[in-house]
Amino acid sequence: MLNGLNAQNHKTLKVLFLGNSYTYVNNLPQLIKDIALANGDTLLFDSNCPGGHTFNNHFNNATSISKINSQAWDCVVLQAQSQEPSFSPAQVEAQTLPYAIKLDSIIKHNNICAETVFFETWGRKNGDASNCAAYPPICTYIGMQNRLRSSYKLFADTTHSIMSPAGEAWRKSIALNPNLELYSSDQSHPALEGSYLTACVFYETLFHKSVLSNTYTAGLSATNVGFLQQVAHDVLNDSLLVWNIGKYPSCITTDLTEISYQPNVIIYPNPTQKTLHTNTNLPFKIYDILGILCLSGNKSNSINIESLKSGVYFIELSYLNSTKKIRFVKE
């Protein structure tokens, strides 16, 4: 459960948004920042959101790649072109999933502790008329929304990343209060109400705190604000593990003594099959997910892990009076 936290738990996050018009309409990152600020938190963000951009486009966009590598982001939000993830499973697996994987790999290579967050969008109000004949399941809003959910869940599960279920919050809002219009006049892009709901979902997803009773309203009525906050909160908390929130901790650091010159440890590749490399040469221990010691040694720059079974492990690296634990996957 995501609960409201006091002033001693204020957080600062650095987040990069890579998407398109669904992200830049109504300036979604700024809405999230304003909600965070009202709760004493700080969102430092950058974005690259050219209209209609796909994951493939971002992978081949020098600006997007440069921004990923520009600093150690806490989170990078990836939003696909609005229709593409709703296409047939075979088409999504061939056309979209490979670039979700490639972008996630670049993000993790830049900062192994970064979290990739897949921004699940919403179906068009009356389905995708332009692609209905070619793929009838997306002829309706519900059919399109179901495919979006499945695809974004696929992206998140495949890369061991987070899914921010904005589209599921839209689904719940529409079911409970169909008269509250979330769409703009084109029945695709968000009205301010839709962007505010999405921002509430993202605040809870990124900061792991409750949005309930947040005082930032974006100029919306108190009634609508309260309703949208509750919808976002309910959707997040009903299914935290479905959205992979807290399921795949990318980095766990246990500092016995804080040391200003502790090395910035990177492990690669992750996932891996035979060998795990680090950018240090420190004593190491490898534990399985149950905390059982599986391997240990004195030099961590190249570790043979062929003896490990497939699964999730943690490597613990020791440096003076400090230890760092990092999660990795053996395939």
Language-model features, listed with the residues they occupy:
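Bacterial Sec-dependent N-terminal signal peptides
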Residues: 1-10, 256, 314, 325
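Conserved SGNH/GDSL esterase-like catalytic core that processes O-acyl groups on lipids
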Residues: 12-16, 22-101, 106, 112
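C-terminal outer-membrane/trafficking sorting elements
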Residues: 257-331
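Extracytoplasmic/secreted proteins, especially bacterial periplasmic and envelope-associated proteins
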Residues: 17, 27-34, 63, 91, ...
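Conserved catalytic region of serine esterases and O-acyltransferases that act on ester linkages
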Residues: 11, 182, 189, 193, ...
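Conserved beta-strand termini and adjacent loop/short-helix elements that scaffold enzyme active sites
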Residues: 46-50, 119, 166, 331
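Structured segments of extracytoplasmic/periplasmic soluble domains
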Residues: 21, 25, 31-39, 79, ...
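Alpha-helical cap/lid subdomain in secreted, periplasmic
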Residues: 67-188, 192
